[in-house]
Amino acid sequence: MNNLKINLHPNDEKIHFNEKDHSYKINGKSIQFSVSQIIDDFFPKFDSEYWSRVKAKERLDFLGKSYSIEKLNETQKKIIDEWELKRDEAAKKGTLLHEAIEEYYNRGELTDLIPEFKFFQEFLKKYPKIQPYRTEWRVFDSKNSIAGTIDMVYKKKNGDLFIFDWKRSTKLVNDIGTVIKSDFDYGFDELSNISNNSYNKYCLQQNLYKYILEDNYGKKVSSMNLLVLHPRYHTYFHIQVPDLTKETEFLIRKAREKVI
């Protein structure tokens, strides 16, 4: 596999990513928004205090015994700790998968230590002619102080690009690959038509990446995609991302207002 450093862009020298706090700098100056951050600003935040209390009561009620407020507090803390541990483990495993795919594309190295990597290999077998262009590409829009990292960029024969994000998640599709579009609550302002779920947020991320590449890098992005790779499933699931032009323009406009 060819080293994809041959496709460097002049902007690559200007952007720096801090792994510890997941922040970006452009020419040494901190940017205001990551792609995920500007999106999260327009959706309800998960109230862990409230929902952990609800789950603690459910857990104790299931036992069919009376309990003290101290026992309720203890159970609530245990649930919060369980959530944090699960989140940390998922993040670590997701990072390992991303690194394994990057190693494959940049060094030709394969691994059998990550179960879901075999699904990525199945994807490659189905599309053997796709041309890799960049992995883990950090991109930015200096005018609006936004930056993010695209997991994978492929190139068509006509020069157009198409982008992928790898998702090691069970929140995007069910066991037969149907997209989970829960609509418990919705976004704010001009995103009030967008339900608050992982699928919609990832679609907005992809649309922002497309905007950044086309407006700042002189590229044409022909399609946006998510590839779900999780050991719970029997195979990979490929999700094509729709164009959300109006919503993307809104996010860019709000970012610009805060920068100015």
Which residues make up each language-model segment?
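Catalytic cores of nuclease domains that cleave nucleic-acid phosphodiester backbones
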Residues: 79-191
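A short, sequence-level motif marking secondary-structure junctions
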Residues: 36-40, 169, 242-248
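Accessory terminal regions of nucleic-acid processing enzymes
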Residues: 1-2, 9-14, 106, 142-143, ...
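Metal-dependent nuclease catalytic regions and adjoining charged, substrate-binding loops involved
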Residues: 195-260
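Charged, glycine-rich intrinsically disordered N-terminal tails and low-complexity linkers that flank
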Residues: 1-96
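Secondary-structure junction/capping motif
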Residues: 30-37, 114-117, 196-197
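A broadly tuned preference for mixed-charge, low-complexity surface segments
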Residues: 6-10, 139, 146-156, 161, ...
